[in-house]
Amino acid sequence: MALNIEEIIASVKEASVLELNDLVKAIEEEFGVTAAAPVAVAAAGGAAAEQTEFTVELASAGDSKIKVIKVVREITGLGLKEAKELVDNAPKALKEGIAKDEAEEIKAKLEEVGANVEVK
C-alpha cells in the first residue's frame, strides 16, 4: 500500500468539521498523542521579565487614620465618605497599573502620615 500524500490532503480538504474532529480523536487514540498546543515553559534561572505595572495597597491606616484619609483623598480623588470606607476596609488597593516611580511616591506620602503600604 503506497501512501499518496496528495490524495490524503485532498480527502482532508473535502471532509466536514465533524469528520475532521473524529479523525483527530482517532489519531490521538491510535498513537497515544494529543492535538493540544504545546505549553511554553519558562527556563528556570532565566532572567525574569521586569515588572512594569504596580499596585499600591493600603495594608492598614496605622495610628493617624484622619491624616491617612486626607492623603487617600488627595491620591485617588475620592470623596470623604469613599476615602474613609477604603481606609476602614484595609487592606485595599489604592491605585493599580501604575509606574514604579508613581507607586513609590504614593507609598512615601502614605508612610509619612503613618500608614502601612505595600507596592505589588
UniProtKB/Swiss-Prot annotation:
The record ties this protein, via CDD domains, to: Ribosomal_L7_L12
Q: What Gene Ontology cellular component terms go with this record?
A: cytosolic large ribosomal subunit
Q: Which UniProt keywords apply?
A: Ribonucleoprotein, Ribosomal protein
Please, one GO biological process term? Answer: translation
List the InterPro entries hit by this protein, alphabetically.
Ribosomal_bL12, Ribosomal_bL12_C, Ribosomal_bL12_C/ClpS-like, Ribosomal_bL12_oligo, Ribosomal_bL12_oligo_N_sf
Q: Per the record, a Pfam family?
A: Ribosomal_L12_N
The GO terms describing molecular function are:
mRNA binding; structural constituent of ribosome
Q: What family is reported?
A: Belongs to the bacterial ribosomal protein bL12 family.
How does this polypeptide assemble, per the annotation? Homodimer. Part of the ribosomal stalk of the 50S ribosomal subunit. Forms a multimeric L10(L12)X complex, where L10 forms an elongated spine to which 2 to 4 L12 dimers bind in a sequential fashion. Binds GTP-bound translation factors.
Question: What is the annotated role of this protein in its UniProt record?
Answer: Forms part of the ribosomal stalk which helps the ribosome interact with GTP-bound translation factors. Is thus essential for accurate translation.
> What's the protein here called?
Large ribosomal subunit protein bL12
| Record organism | Listeria monocytogenes serovar 1/2a (strain ATCC BAA-679 / EGD-e)
